[in-house]
Design a protein with these regions (language model features):
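Rossmann-like NAD(P)-binding element
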Residues: 65-126
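Rossmann-like NAD(P)(H) cofactor-binding subdomain of soluble oxidoreductases
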Residues: 100-165
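C-terminal substrate-binding/catalytic lobe of Rossmann-fold NAD(P)-dependent dehydrogenases
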Residues: 145-152, 160-309
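Conserved N-terminal Rossmann-fold NAD(P) cofactor-binding segment
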Residues: 47-84, 301-309
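N-terminal Rossmann-fold NAD(P) dinucleotide-binding loop
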Residues: 26-27
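Glycine-rich Rossmann-fold phosphate-binding loop(s) that bind the pyrophosphate
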Residues: 22-23
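Aromatic pocket-lining residues of Rossmann-like dinucleotide-binding sites
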Residues: 33
Length: 309
């Protein structure tokens, strides 16, 4: 019995997280996952090879302080991603103060197209979590260019927006915030789902929405970038895949008829598990929510056309 137990244990799949992009967000996500998850392997790819190697070395030292000794490698060669359960993509440019996320679209689409091809050459079985902005457009580009099934490619945007919404509601004295989701574009057309909000004494939401929509720019103006909030949001999604939690959360996912829309990636409620997007949850959204979602889809499709999709 003991031998069988050991044998079974040795067959337990190793949890490996790959990263393409070892910059502020990628490295902070890796640092977060190192602390929160029992990951056996982390691989960080970046065009700045020394950055990726340096981050891997620093992360390995941090792990030792936690009594953890995962294999952590960095470099510019995509072959180190082989066997990743999930690849987290933050490769690309970040916006500067005064820019919108959409201003990054043309440049980052070219990067994501190349990254998609290289991920499929090195780790074709991985789920892909896209973070690079504008994330809804980059998730679509990743899906199209990788050729993967739509459940295996998804983006993190509204998860972060929803965390910001919860904080803003808390500061306004809202209690028992069971569900407070931002849906739609991870951008200026994002909206608070009034259909799905579940909390006590919810205030008028117009001002709250404006705060959430533009708070990232305020952070960027002061510290140059956002990465702690994004890292926790990304960790929540990575954890759902690696531990098959089947947690329901807002995610940028490829629609094929859901909510009446197709051929676009946009933030909607989804169940995330070992298969990636396990299910898109088609709640009967009220007319205002549907109008807002339609507005996001229209904007995103116009920008996809500009990118040649
Ligand atoms: N979806 C979200 O909620 C969210 C949150 C925060 C940041 N972001 C986005 O994530 C991206 C990264 O942000 P950051 O602050 O980490 O930027 P950063 O500049 O610190 O890191 C980006 C990294 O990508 C690397 N890179 C560039 N082109 C590459 C390529 N072709 N292959 C591999 N690596 C490449 C760069 O060398 C750099 O290290 C930006 O687009 C930013 O807007 C999205
Ligand atoms: O706003 C940005 O440019 C980064 C990210 O999308 C965020 O919302 O923090």
């Amino acid at each position: 019995m003991y031998f069988n137990f050991v044998k079974e244990q040795s067959e337990v799949a190793k949890m490996k997280i790959g990263f393409v992009g070892a910059g502020r967000v990628g490295s902070t996500i890796a640092f977060t996952c190192l602390q929160q998850l029992d990951v056996e392997e982390i691989a960080l790819v970046d065009i700045m090879e020394n950055l990726a190697i340096g981050e891997a070395m620093d992360l390995a030292h941090a792990a030792a302080g936690l009594g953890k000794y995962p294999e952590i490698v960095g470099g510019s060669d995509y072959s180190i991603l082989e066997g990743s359960d999930i690849v987290v993509v933050t490769a690309g440019s970040a916006r500067k103060p005064g820019m919108s996320r959409l201003d990054l679209a043309m440049k980052n689409a070219g990067i994501i197209k190349d990254v998609a091809r290289k991920i499929m050459e090195s780790s074709p079985e991985s789920k892909i979590l896209v973070i690079t902005n504008p994330v809804d457009l980059m998730t679509y580009v990743m899906w199209k260019e990788s050729g993967k099934s739509r459940n295996e490619v998804f983006g993190m945007g509204n998860m972060l927006d929803s965390m910001r919404l919860k904080r803003t509601l808390h500061e306004l004295g809202v209690k028992n915030i069971n569900k407070a989701w931002i849906l739609g574009e991870h951008g200026d057309s994002m909206f608070i789902s009034r259909t799905l909000i579940d909390a006590e004494n919810v205030p008028e939401l117009e001002k709250v929405l404006s705060e959430v929509r533009f708070v990232a720019a305020e952070v960027i103006k002061r510290k140059g970038a956002t990465f702690y909030g994004p890292a926790i949001a990304a960790y929540r999604m990575i954890n759902a895949v690696l531990n098959n939690t089947k947690e329901e959360m807002p995610a940028s996912v490829i629609l094929k008829g859901e909510f009446g829309f197709s051929d676009v990636s946009v933030g909607v409620p989804a169940i995330i598990g070992k298969n990636g997007v396990e299910k898109i949850v088609e709640y009967p959204l009220d007319p205002q929510d549907m109008e807002n979602l339609r507005n996001s889809v229209k904007l995103l499709k116009e920008r996809l056309k500009e990118l040649g999709y």
